[in-house]
Amino acid sequence: MLRARPEALMLLGALLTGSLGPSGNQDALSLPWEVQRYDGWFNNLRHHERGAVGCRLQRRVPANYADGVYQALEEPQLPNPRRLSNAATRGIAGLPSLHNRTVLGVFFGYHVLSDVVSVETPGCPAEFLNIRIPPGDPVFDPDQRGDVVLPFQRSRWDPETGRSPSNPRDLANQVTGWLDGSAIYGSSHSWSDALRSFSGGQLASGPDPAFPRDSQNPLLMWAAPDPATGQNGPRGLYAFGAERGNREPFLQALGLLWFRYHNLWAQRLARQHPDWEDEELFQHARKRVIATYQNIAVYEWLPSFLQKTLPEYTGYRPFLDPSISPEFVVASEQFFSTMVPPGVYMRNASCHFRKVLNKGFQSSQALRVCNNYWIRENPNLNSTQEVNELLLGMASQISELEDNIVVEDLRDYWPGPGKFSRTDYVASSIQRGRDMGLPSYSQALLAFGLDIPRNWSDLNPNVDPQVLEATAALYNQDLSQLELLLGGLLESHGDPGPLFSAIVLDQFVRLRDGDRYWFENTRNGLFSKKEIEDIRNTTLRDVLVAVINIDPSALQPNVFVWHKGAPCPQPKQLTTDGLPQCAPLTVLDFFEGSSPGFAITIIALCCLPLVSLLLSGVVAYFRGREHKKLQKKLKESVKKEAAKDGVPAMEWPGPKERSSPIIIQLLSDRCLQVLNRHLTVLRVVQLQPLQQVNLILSNNRGCRTLLLKIPKEYDLVLLFSSEEERGAFVQQLWDFCVRWALGLHVAEMSEKELFRKAVTKQQRERILEIFFRHLFAQVLDINQADAGTLPLDSSQKVREALTCELSRAEFAESLGLKPQDMFVESMFSLADKDGNGYLSFREFLDILVVFMKGSPEDKSRLMFTMYDLDENGFLSKDEFFTMMRSFIEISNNCLSKAQLAEVVESMFRESGFQDKEELTWEDFHFMLRDHDSELRFTQLCVKGGGGGGNGIRDIFKQNISCRVSFITRTPGERSHPQGLGPPAPEAPELGGPGLKKRFGKKAAVPTPRLYTEALQEKMQRGFLAQKLQQYKRFVENYRRHIVCVAIFSAICVGVFADRAYYYGFASPPSDIAQTTLVGIILSRGTAASVSFMFSYILLTMCRNLITFLRETFLNRYVPFDAAVDFHRWIAMAAVVLAILHSAGHAVNVYIFSVSPLSLLACIFPNVFVNDGSKLPQKFYWWFFQTVPGMTGVLLLLVLAIMYVFASHHFRRRSFRGFWLTHHLYILLYALLIIHGSYALIQLPTFHIYFLVPAIIYGGDKLVSLSRKKVEISVVKAELLPSGVTYLQFQRPQGFEYKSGQWVRIACLALGTTEYHPFTLTSAPHEDTLSLHIRAVGPWTTRLREIYSSPKGNGCAGYPKLYLDGPFGEGHQEWHKFEVSVLVGGGIGVTPFASILKDLVFKSSLGSQMLCKKIYFIWVTRTQRQFEWLADIIQEVEENDHQDLVSVHIYVTQLAEKFDLRTTMLYICERHFQKVLNRSLFTGLRSITHFGRPPFEPFFNSLQEVHPQVRKIGVFSCGPPGMTKNVEKACQLVNRQDRAHFMHHYENF
């Protein structure tokens, strides 16, 4: 084998180590030797890692773990550590060392140990071997609680170990495993740099050159709190190379000694070599100090410690492993602990042992060890002289006897971990041995080739037998279970026992012979032989003399041993007597003083929505103040008007309702009128002569309330500002009653009783509703159970309410008509038999019975009597004209006066009464009977039929011929297959020439008829049945929504469960789950769900994407129209999860605030470093001084603002405020990104969810910005019934669209960026565009208010619009079919309005169209929903000369709700439609059906009517339930080999 030259090896080592200088530069190349690395690497050129920082301990004996891998042995396998400590190591202090070893040697041993090994640093993830304290322990459990546990965290281990029995856990050494002065210079290059001054080769000093500077953050010095005083922080701790060099002032003194010795050598070298630079001076001084340290430790201190010398040094042995063994750590530390005295003397060079200052400025003869752990700014060590005195005192003081006894300063008052200020050093060392997996005492003896004692008494004859008995009892007399630590202590007396001596000797031999940089190794080029000899002759006494600068005679030659006759003997062997008492155990409360602040912070965060609510209230207030200024003049005029003839007051409408300001006027003719503050009449009460009026006054709570009870009316409850104002009104009312001969009865009662006695409008309406149900149940033969039951309350209030009668206005309102309509006047006058101006329920019932159950003679006689205005028994032509005009008024005035006169003449002429001026009842009945017979059966128009009525000039005939071809079955008809009824021989033939037939002619050839009879659904009676039906309809209508919400929710639950399970049970060990399981599961799970929700909520606002997708097949599965609702749902779910996320972190913050720093350093290794200070950060640090905390608070604030301002109530008050605050979403996402970027618990993951939706949303926004938007002037605006606003505006040049398409508009008065989609109701041929907008939301409601009246003259007064579109729909394909069926549900009719007008226009021009027939079916719950469409359908009917359009209207709300207006529609419609061939209420020729459309029979009959048509298009728009029924009917009909029905639908 080739041997390398030493120079080559040196160069190779320098290159490999990289330690060529302070920063690896070329400066060190000028040095004649290879500079040793600070971290221990590359000492051994074959095994580079040996002795390096972080290298694992090397076992000399196999591990002894409970599972053979890493689990430590605990109770009950082994005894309790505290019991063992008390039994084996408790004893009397004050016994001197058998060989007069000095205290300086003890602490020098600790210093040497800190140079080669450090395993005290807690490991991560945190594992605990807590020490259970026996109940009643005098130190740790004086109160006998029995639940005291001293925490013990297992040490840091090599992560590559602990995986199998062949690779058990090994602890990692946190310093270099070489005797290389790392306790002086640190164990890393950066640590050494932090200690250096980089000037003159010296270590950096503080203000006093004899002291190093204070500990700084880069050094990471261990800064445990002072257990005696609780003082903490780095202030007062010196910067040393040893992490725990400040544990005791005795270790500090040795650290200061070597600090000063290095600087002394640097100064000496600088004087000798003035041309050397800092690096050369430092490395030469360092080299010399390390060599001196090695020499003293191995050749001076170790022999005095072991009473043995090492073999002669024979040279470097590269194949010898010098790694520190765990057995050495325990053997050395425990033997040192037996020698530590309870106190330490201080003396000067003249042998004067001085007094020391203690807490409270009391003096004692020595420093008490237990009160000087981690002490800051020790008053006894403020100067160099005092440090020198401490070193001299330790050199003269004899240590404790080397036996099994450990003084109480270590056994009971060692610095404690966690919240405990004290712990048991021996018990902790026993746990440390178990943590290391140390073998038993017997196994170690075998491994080192030593004899095993046969029994307990053979251990050591010098040990107290009681100690052996107590120890043996704890081990159950099993000597094989005796642990290494206690066995080594028990075998020692005066000197380390055989086992400890063998372990220590073996370790130092390997340290010396395996170190390539050992000072005696002449091959490393460090020293010459002369320098080596000089170093060998240097002792610690020489170091002390050089540093302290004293006479050598003040010290014995060997400072580690004091021999008789040596200078300065100690006054006496120190005992605990005369020394201060050890500061007792204290248990820290990390959360002390933080509870109020934490509670206030949580409350403040919870109040963020309230703050936002207050802010929204301020905004609403200022907005309302501007509005009030505009109405100030109006209010003043109202007040003046009210002051003249009215009394202001507040009306109480009922419980849980807000009182409103009103004005009461007592008018002439016994009239009491109620107005609002705008002088709009709210209520008029007409009193009758001699009518009794009851007045009830409140007699408490300020006497401001009165109750006015008027017969046949609901009560009026008034609240006045003061009793005086109420008295003034009572006086006016009294004068009013006296003037008009009215009776007034006055009573008093409490205000609460007055409110309870009042019959409010709502109460009356509820009672009347049930009464109407019973009335119609009798008339319409409805089951009484369906009608409901009367309340069982028989109180006076109910009896009074049941006696009330309907006024003329209430009667008109019940019919849905105007009070001034002639029909209302006529019917009311007829029904009011007693002429008292009110309509009783019996009178109302009589008129209903005639309408519904009367014979044709009864009905005609009733009509005859209604319009026989002069009551002469004859109906004149003028009275007949009045009757017809009343019908026309109800029918929206669809015929002019001239046309009506012509109709009357035609009817007289057709009936043969053209020569009569008056009709008897018989004549009138004959006229109606004849028309009723003709209108009951009407022949269906055949395919392509048109031109009907062209030859008829009579208007009435034309109306008959153009009537929508609906065929209703007679009561006697039976249903036939496919919905086709039997032929009707008396039905006239319509279509072509058949339209010209006179009334009364019979059809010779029957034709197929459409089945259009409405399906009456029976109302479910039982509560459960109603709920089930409600649930079924809900699922039917929202099945797509439910599926999408279920899928989205499943994803959210999935990501929640994934993250919660991962961080709770499957994540890499980090202690966070063990520390705060509930908090981490809640916070991590909700964080993932919130990230997903807040990311994908952006897709619900991608309008252009949604517009595109709505036209694809995906619309069948995804309800794109519900994007805004889905947006709200996601937002609400996200904010709930965000609150839970915050609650989870509130739990986390509390737990982190009460967790020791050692645990937090494991959980957050990138944030915290365990420096022993224990104290965690306060709660406010987590909330306000961290990026996640501060951004989290800001996120809560932003969410509070956005959610409060987005509430429905505030949007109605200030939509602009909602729109502006909602743009905070940009800040929201910025904070979300920053919030997770800190990687406190996990790496940022928000971008994983956010990236794709953000790109899509950004692209969608760019499309919106690039789209052309045209400013349009509104030509006409009209407010239609049912809350519908009609807007007609200019058609931009080049604006092309198809019927059925929709646009997006923005009103400039409501904001230029807010667009809403609406379907065009104008036809493509029209010059203007029109929209019918129903007020269902805040924007559409405000739009209706804005266009209620123009601000200027003409169209210029209307706000302009922005127009965006048009956009396509599936309904524009209607023209591709010969026959199309349009089915609209509710407001879903709007797409078809444009289609109908477009169809009629094209047909009137004679355009060639494939479409020959349109059937328009509209399904609506109540006639209120189609009032606004009457004009459009009427226009279509008037222009439809070819009979292309057939209109069906189905009202589904009848027996199920018993709406009075709908029920009256049913009655009047069936009776009066036969008179004028128009619907009584809509004015349309189409028949209004009551029930649900029979789609399947209708489609079957449609095949019979159009047999030549092979494809029929069906287009439906409305709620999902309706479109589903249409789809189902199409599927059933398509099973037949006949016409194919192609269904296209849109849901809203």
Swiss-Prot record:
**Effect caused by changing residue 1518 to S:** In TDH6; the enzyme is non-functional; expressed at the cell surface of cells albeit at low level
Tissue occurrence: Expressed in colon, small intestine, duodenum and tracheal surface epithelial cells (at protein level). Expressed in thyrocytes. Also detected in kidney, liver, lung, pancreas, prostate, salivary glands, rectum and testis.
Q: What is the effect of changing residue 1211 to C?
A: Found in a patient with very early onset inflammatory bowel disease; uncertain significance; no effect on subcellular location; significantly reduced ROS generation, which may decrease resistance to infection by enteric pathogens, such as Escherichia coli
Give me the disulphide-bonded residues.
124-1162
Positions annotated to bind Ca(2+) 2: 868, 870, 872, 879
Alphabetized UniProt keyword annotations: Calcium, Cell junction, Cell membrane, Congenital hypothyroidism, Disease variant, Disulfide bond, FAD, Flavoprotein, Glycoprotein, Hydrogen peroxide, Membrane, Metal-binding, NADP, Oxidoreductase, Peroxidase, Repeat, Signal, Thyroid hormones biosynthesis, Transmembrane, Transmembrane helix
Explain the induction of this protein: By forskolin, thyrotropin and the Th1-specific cytokine IFNG/IFN-gamma.
Substrates-to-products reaction catalysed? NADH + O2 + H(+) = H2O2 + NAD(+); NADPH + O2 + H(+) = H2O2 + NADP(+)
Cleavable signal peptide = 1-25
Q: Which GO terms describe its molecular function?
A: calcium ion binding; heme binding; NAD(P)H oxidase H2O2-forming activity; NADH oxidase H202-forming activity; NADPH oxidase H202-forming activity; peroxidase activity; superoxide-generating NAD(P)H oxidase activity
Annotated protein name in UniProt: Dual oxidase 2
The organism's taxonomy opens as: Eukaryota, Metazoa, Chordata, Craniata, Vertebrata
